């Protein structure tokens, strides 16, 4: 397990994404001043720093792996954001905040850890009355994906939904969908897959006699190769949502 953490340590990101994508999604939100922002599953915080550059509010960045938080804290200090970026080691399904604390919740590539619908339901109480949540979620882009890709994701993320399916979950969880944005395929590679693949090559040479680790490395390589072949079949979609009424409350006097 320590070697697997080492495999990922020092990568720019812990999942697909880019500053350009983060800024693009921010441009799709209603133009308002966000004063209290929560970044859930922040990892080493590349998107956290992008949010800090683009927004004037205070940010709480949450992850349950302290080394990632240490990297973020160091980088935030280097950019003079230490007064606005706070790190917190906590679980995303037990966030220690009062109701209505945040006017913007952001989470890139992390909500899958607890499930899209469950995350939306649990985080909703943390938002102000008209607060906004933005998440990127792995999403089927084809109604009939090739069998190889279907088998892989059934094994690794069986809860993956289509855009239509996630849109229904958004409404059922008490949100108004404001916008969606498909992460460009190039944003999977520059800061994530490309450096990860180089690390996989190095680890394969160094630890090739460790059968268990080699199996993990091969699984990571399989994921990268799969996306090269099927990037038009699935991808990360950003969902920007505003807190609204729960379905059962609509129409209530």
Q: Which positions does each model-derived feature cover?
A:
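Conserved Class I S-adenosyl-L-methionine
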Residues: 182-253
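Conserved alpha-helix/loop element of class I SAM-dependent methyltransferases that forms part
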Residues: 15-33
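A short acidic, Gly/Pro-enriched loop at the edge of an enzyme's catalytic core
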Residues: 93-104
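A short SAM/SAH-binding and catalytic strip from SAM-dependent methyltransferases
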Residues: 104-117
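Short alpha-helix
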Residues: 159-174
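A short glycine-rich, Lys/Arg-flanked "PGG" loop and its adjoining helix->strand segment in the class I
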Residues: 118-132
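Short, glycine-/aromatic-enriched active-site segment of Class I SAM-dependent methyltransferases
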Residues: 138-157
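Class I SAM-dependent methyltransferase SAM/SAH-binding core
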Residues: 38, 46-94
């Amino acid at each position: 397990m320590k070697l697997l953490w080492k495999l990922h340590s020092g990568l720019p990101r812990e999942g697909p994404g880019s500053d350009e994508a983060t800024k693009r999604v921010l441009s799709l939100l209603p133009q308002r001043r966000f004063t209290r922002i929560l970044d859930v599953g922040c990892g080493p915080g590349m998107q956290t720093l992008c949010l800090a550059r683009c927004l004037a509010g205070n940010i709480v960045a949450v992850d349950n792996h302290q080394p990632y938080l240490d990297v973020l804290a160091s980088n935030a200090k280097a950019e003079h954001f230490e007064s606005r970026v706070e790190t917190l080691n906590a679980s995303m399904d037990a966030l220690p905040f009062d109701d209505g604390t945040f006017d913007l919740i952001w989470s890139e590539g992390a909500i899958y850890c607890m499930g899209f619908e469950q995350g939306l339901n649990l985080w909703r109480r943390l938002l102000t009355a008209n607060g906004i949540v933005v998440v990127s979620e792995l999403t089927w882009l084809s109604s009939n994906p090739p069998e190889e890709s279907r088998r892989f994701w059934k094994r690794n993320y069986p809860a993956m939904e289509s855009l239509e399916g996630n849109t229904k979950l958004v409404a059922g969880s008490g949100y108004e969908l404001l916008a969606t944005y498909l992460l460009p395929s190039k944003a999977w590679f520059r800061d994530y897959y490309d450096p990860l693949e180089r690390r996989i090559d190095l680890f394969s040479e160094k630890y090739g006699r460790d059968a268990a680790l080699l199996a993990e490395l091969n699984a990571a390589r399989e994921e990268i190769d799969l996306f090269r072949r099927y990037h038009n079949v699935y991808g990360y979609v950003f969902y920007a949502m505003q807190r609204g009424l729960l379905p059962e409350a609509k129409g209530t006097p």
